[in-house]
Amino acid sequence: MWCCNARRGVKLLSHNPNKNPINQSRIRNLEMDDKWIIHFLKKVQVGHFVTMDKNQPFINPSSFWYSSKRHEIYFHSNAYGRMRYNAEKQSNASFECFRSGKLLPSNLALEMSFQYECVIAFGTIMVIQKIDEKKEI
């Protein structure tokens, strides 16, 4: 939680999203290599897919499967519903999955935190229509 009041002379903290490409970590020394990411994607069972409906983001938890052959993430959704509708209207999407680590308690609520590992991906989403292609995957 951040609460800053500029009138009291508090310096506002900011992050410039244009400083680095948007798909790069803000803290470079915490980035993981492709080998770690692939191993992690094969262990985690649930991810969160984000699609867009005009300007409204929509997040949906789902089981998924990572194909190291195609370097793609696959999931199954309902033939009708928000995810399917969004995927057919706009292909921009993002994905996140994580695994919780240790709780890092503190006597001060704002300093409490927890450790975690995660993968975040940006890309496009598409509906696989053909039965033959579904079977191949």
Please place each PLM-identified region on the residue numbering:
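Short beta-strand segments
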Residues: 44-79, 95
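Short helix-to-loop capping/linker segments positioned immediately adjacent to catalytic or ligand/cofactor-binding
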Residues: 48, 52-53, 83, 126-131
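Short, basic/aromatic recognition patches
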Residues: 19-48
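Charged, gly/pro-rich active-site loop segments
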Residues: 2-28, 102-137
